[in-house]
């Protein structure tokens, strides 16, 4: 089985040196992602594409799914290679491969050719298209927007039959740009902004300012791990959690009501800048959008920026909320954001939309900055791959089991799409489906006399959700790992 990976167009217009560097990094990223599927996958880079080959036909779906989520890839072609003698032989093989698909359909033939031949690409298109039209009476040629496009590639003496095409997410390969630190809250905005910087070639680390206890932190870890696992798993990244409750308490006590929002954001920027400097990160990423809330006016954003010399990137600055939610839906973070626990430590009755620098600095003069230094120095830094292990250490009473008792119910908390693609079947075991994003609201409705074994494929989501349910007072929860 072979896949041909086509590069994002912006990569192809780079200088030769830059283009080769980008292709080399992309090939390395692909290897890092696919090595989790097996050792028998070969990745070979060329000037204008990257080949992925495997002898295991069963890995095709998983390989394709992984490739569609790696930044830097424009599209993926699943192909079959054959030898050919002449144009008529090309037609015969195209008819064999595509004939059954063209009955009662409109079609066109598209050919790309490399090498020296006695025919042109257009001549092959006309010859193959004419032959298919003659041999399949119910098929009709339609050059614009046909039902089926017969894609052929000719590389020297090899005919490449394109069996399927899958769209990638585009962008630049992760690692071609410098690292950034995303201020993630688990909501719509921060998840989308993190994805946009990953797609632009940055390795994204995560910084979370905890205002609402462990339940909020668990939810945010789920979002960060999901984003990394889905789009950025080719690289190691950090998840930094800062306990910001002491800072909030100091603001509530020392800062005027109308200035609290801007002061809190300035404190977050200062703390994030210290974290970024500690790990050699060049910029901070936020999900702020112009005018969305009172602290996000131009005047207030300028004052927030002035709190630090670190570059602050705001990829969503001109996006409206509806567009942001649509993007969250496309990348799969919408359900996380909708069910994320909401915590607001600083609530101003009349927040300023046009803060004055002198007033802000006067309010901050009352703030004990030793508190800020302390919470930053005590920030928890964890490799995002170790989130599951960290959860296990935090809550030792969450039991992991491999067998079932008579009263046990296996609770499949994977998303509906994952359950449909890879249904769970176990003989003699009661299995219920309850996606992770519905657990917090619907778990309490389940029969209390049963013990529920939470299951997900990697064990990360199930452990985090079990931790959350345990903190909510449920003692009939375990984690199932086959």
UniProtKB/Swiss-Prot annotation:
It comes from the Bacteria. Its main location: cytoplasm. It catalyses: [ThiI sulfur-carrier protein]-S-sulfanyl-L-cysteine + a uridine in tRNA + 2 reduced [2Fe-2S]-[ferredoxin] + ATP + H(+) = [ThiI sulfur-carrier protein]-L-cysteine + a 4-thiouridine in tRNA + 2 oxidized [2Fe-2S]-[ferredoxin] + AMP + diphosphate; [ThiS sulfur-carrier protein]-C-terminal Gly-Gly-AMP + S-sulfanyl-L-cysteinyl-[cysteine desulfurase] + AH2 = [ThiS sulfur-carrier protein]-C-terminal-Gly-aminoethanethioate + L-cysteinyl-[cysteine desulfurase] + A + AMP + 2 H(+). One of its GO terms (molecular function) is ATP binding. Pathway: Cofactor biosynthesis; thiamine diphosphate biosynthesis. Keywords: ATP-binding, Cytoplasm, Disulfide bond, Nucleotide-binding, Redox-active center, RNA-binding, Thiamine biosynthesis, Transferase, tRNA-binding. CDD domains: PPase_ThiI, RHOD, THUMP_ThiI. It is an enzyme of class 2 (transferase). Residues 404-482 form the Rhodanese domain. GO terms for biological process: thiamine biosynthetic process; thiamine diphosphate biosynthetic process; thiazole biosynthetic process; tRNA 4-thiouridine biosynthesis. SUPFAM superfamilies: Adenine nucleotide alpha hydrolases-like, Rhodanese/Cell cycle control phosphatase, THUMP domain-like. Residues 61-165 form the THUMP domain. The active site is at residue 456. ATP binds at residues 183-184, 265, 287, 296. The keyword tRNA processing does not apply. Its EC number is 2.8.1.4. Catalyzes the ATP-dependent transfer of a sulfur to tRNA to produce 4-thiouridine in position 8 of tRNAs, which functions as a near-UV photosensor. Also catalyzes the transfer of sulfur to the sulfur carrier protein ThiS, forming ThiS-thiocarboxylate. This is a step in the synthesis of thiazole, in the thiamine biosynthesis pathway. The sulfur is donated as persulfide by IscS. This is tRNA sulfurtransferase. It comes from Photorhabdus laumondii subsp. laumondii (strain DSM 15139 / CIP 105565 / TT01) (Photorhabdus luminescens subsp. laumondii). The gene is thiI.
